[in-house]
């Protein structure tokens, strides 16, 4: 393949468009950040605040893990004494498996993937899909003390909302 320089021999402007375009910075609309308040205003974020931020005291951070990850690694977890082998199945405290569990407010198991082993999982919260998949494979789910408190609070708020209607 021929070089670009060689291909452009004989052309007047070497790919620069009109002969006027390569003079100074006029074709670019100025140098650097010039025109940010005038002719290039559309390239900048709008000024001012917008949106809503929830108060910090009501925000909760969840550490999550999918049942797929637990199921795929359960034999390794048992070898590392993180999971216990019992009656042909495995008992796993999910808080010991999730790396971010110490920094998070609670640990939740999500339902992505398949469950092939009989698992007894202990965690603060479970998605409906995770609960169904674990129980469908012959296992069970158990809530921690924190999980039971959270569930009781959720039921209280649901009852209060139902009373208001």
UniProtKB/Swiss-Prot annotation:
The record's annotation in SUPFAM superfamilies points to: Ribosomal proteins L15p and L18e
Example GO CC term: the record gives:
cytosolic large ribosomal subunit
Annotated GO biological processes are: translation
Biased amino acid composition, Acidic residues: 154-165
How this chain assembles, per its entry, is:
Part of the 50S ribosomal subunit. Interacts weakly with proteins L18e and L32e.
Role this protein plays:
Binds to the 23S rRNA.
Biased composition, Basic and acidic residues: where in the chain?
30-47
Provide the species name.
Answer: Haloarcula marismortui (strain ATCC 43049 / DSM 3752 / JCM 8966 / VKM B-1809) (Halobacterium marismortui)
InterPro entries the UniProt entry points to: Rbsml_uL15_N, Ribosomal_uL15, Ribosomal_uL15/eL18, Ribosomal_uL15/eL18_sf, Ribosomal_uL15_CS
**Protein family according to the UniProt entry:** Belongs to the universal ribosomal protein uL15 family.
| Keyword field | Ribonucleoprotein, Ribosomal protein, RNA-binding, rRNA-binding
Q: Which GO terms describe its molecular function?
A: rRNA binding; structural constituent of ribosome
* Gene3D superfamilies on file: 3.100.10.10, 4.10.990.10
The answer to whether keyword rRNA-binding applies is: yes
Q: For the region Disordered, what residue ranges are annotated?
A: 1-59, 133-165
**Compositionally skewed regions (Basic residues) per UniProt:** 1-29
Pfam families reported in the protein's UniProt record:
Ribosomal_L27A
Q: Which PROSITE patterns match?
A: RIBOSOMAL_L15
Keyword Ribosomal protein in annotation: yes
Identification of the protein by name:
Large ribosomal subunit protein uL15
């Amino acid at each position: 393949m021929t070089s670009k320089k060689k291909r452009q021999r004989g052309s007047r402007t070497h790919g620069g468009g009109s002969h006027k375009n390569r003079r100074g910075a006029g074709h670019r609309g100025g140098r650097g950040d010039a025109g940010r308040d005038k002719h290039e205003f559309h390239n900048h974020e709008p000024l001012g605040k917008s949106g809503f931020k929830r108060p910090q005291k009501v925000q909760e951070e969840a550490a999550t893990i999918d049942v797929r990850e637990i199921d795929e690694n359960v034999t390794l977890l048992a070898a590392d004494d993180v999971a216990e082998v019992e009656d042909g199945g495995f008992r796993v405290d999910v808080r010991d498996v999730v790396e971010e569990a110490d920094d998070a407010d609670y640990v939740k198991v999500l339902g992505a993937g398949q469950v092939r082993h009989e698992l007894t999982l202990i965690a603060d919260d479970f998605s409906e899909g995770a609960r169904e998949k674990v129980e469908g494979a012959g296992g069970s789910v158990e809530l921690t003390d924190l999980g039971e408190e959270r569930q009781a609070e959720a039921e209280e708020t649901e009852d209060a909302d139902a009373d208001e209607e």
